[in-house]
């Protein structure tokens, strides 16, 4: 590489051979060299000075007479218009390759705005408003806020397209928290209207969205901090105390009691609506849907009841000892018993239930079962979890790890969560049988457990309910000390069963009570409490 002094000498020599008017506009040596490079490669090109101090080099060819130029230009355009698009592109590429750097920059400045067209504004001009609305409807809330600030036309498309309403509707369709909140807060009445005139304007939904976000953040904070409104149903069994099982929906709570009865409660008033009798032993497990209630008892029978009338529709006599747990779904029912067996039933209707297969393999009472289309999962006092094929009822694998008998589990997708009399909770990958995490904190047998996408909630014989961070528990890097979010202590006896959703936990206990832990409707006074868990009591005795 030549030293700068040599380059400068050559440049000065070249500049001296060129009239001064050709390089006067070049403000420095580098620009001079660029201009002279153009001159050397294109002898017919002249470099002209730019005024106003921009120090830019303009290179242009010597223009022929005006008349010839216009004729030649028109002729060139005429031929250009007759060519195909590919030929036009090829011609322009050749043309650009013969130009200098300054000309390239000038063309780039001309093309840049043409390549940055505002298609959202252009589409409505072509009568394609619906396409512009559809494009913007995929934005999340933050992006939609930014889009409103682009220009008035974008704001108009968002407003007339009711895109804030559509965003809220999309969240309600895909997120159970949003769906439940829309029903409980009442703003579901403004959604999914067929005609835009049936509801409020876009501004209503624009202001509603941040209120929903604030509501959700408050609910999550209530879960983390243990703030809740507590309602208590005192069951007051006459013969013996204990609520062994329960299930609820928006309207009712159905519970199975140690006194052999099934009680149905109104969820709003907490009044006992109906008492079902027929079992001759404690009601240990139940499940219901929109048609039937199925119960299992220590009398070793399974009974099927009409959920509306309370009439007994069917009684299944198969197990030799207490029926400890059952699940049914999509025409299949699985029951398990103290007799160490699992029964798989085809459930065509409430009155047409036939035994398909008996699964044998556990060496102690089978305390709990769960299943989906792929696997049946069972847990036993023999310390093992066994996995069976749902379609063939064949044994698949055993999950080993608990040190004592297993009292409860839930299975969904690949995840199994189990609770044991060794006082621990274990998370398992059902496909490979690996134990993913051990949760410690309960002081006695873990009797009941449920999980969703965010949380695990467990109840134990120590009378405590613990809320765990599921996502953190699945992260091997998360410290054990961060996994338990909150411990709830209100029951005075063993916690037998619980169920929860995004807004509440409902639990039952040996203390003969059902507790409703409401994390949505927390009084403002409790919201301001930060040092300790807050609660408000509603006591119902029946």
From Swiss-Prot:
Induction or repression: Expression is negatively regulated by Wnt/beta-catenin pathway.
Ranges of residues in domain F-box: 121-167
Family matches, as Gene3D superfamilies: 1.20.1280.50, 6.10.250.1840, YVTN repeat-like/Quinoprotein amine dehydrogenase
Keywords, comma-separated and alphabetical: Biological rhythms, Cell cycle, Cytoplasm, Nucleus, Repeat, Ubl conjugation pathway, WD repeat, Wnt signaling pathway
InterPro entries per record: Beta-TrCP_D, F-box-like_dom_sf, F-box_dom, G-protein_beta_WD-40_rep, WD-F-box_domain-protein, WD40/YVTN_repeat-like_dom_sf, WD40_repeat_CS, WD40_repeat_dom_sf
WD repeats: 238-275, 278-315, 318-355, 361-398, 401-440, 442-478, 490-527
This protein's pathway: Protein modification; protein ubiquitination
Keyword Kinase: no
Subcellular compartments: Cytoplasm; Nucleus
Pfam families hit by this protein: Beta-TrCP_D (PF12125), F-box-like (PF12937), WD40 (PF00400)
GO molecular function terms noted in the UniProt entry: protein dimerization activity; ubiquitin-like ligase-substrate adaptor activity; ubiquitin-protein transferase activity
Region (Homodimerization domain D): 67-116
Cellular component terms per the entry's GO annotation: cytoplasm; cytosol; nucleus; SCF ubiquitin ligase complex
Biological process annotations from GO: negative regulation of non-canonical NF-kappaB signal transduction; positive regulation of circadian rhythm; positive regulation of DNA-templated transcription; positive regulation of proteolysis; proteasome-mediated ubiquitin-dependent protein catabolic process; protein dephosphorylation; protein destabilization; protein polyubiquitination
Record carries keyword Repeat: yes
Subunit structure, interactors included: Self-associates. Component of the SCF(FBXW11) complex formed of CUL1, SKP1, RBX1 and a FBXW11 dimer. Interacts with BST2 and USP47. Interacts with TRIM21. Interacts with PER3. Interacts with INAVA. Interacts with REST.
Domain notes: The N-terminal D domain mediates homodimerization.
Record function comment: Substrate recognition component of a SCF (SKP1-CUL1-F-box protein) E3 ubiquitin-protein ligase complex which mediates the ubiquitination and subsequent proteasomal degradation of target proteins. Probably recognizes and binds to phosphorylated target proteins: the interaction with substrates requires the phosphorylation of the two serine residues in the substrates' destruction motif D-S-G-X(2,3,4)-S. SCF(FBXW11) mediates the ubiquitination of phosphorylated CTNNB1 and participates in Wnt signaling regulation.
Protein name according to UniProt: F-box/WD repeat-containing protein 11
Native source species: Mus musculus
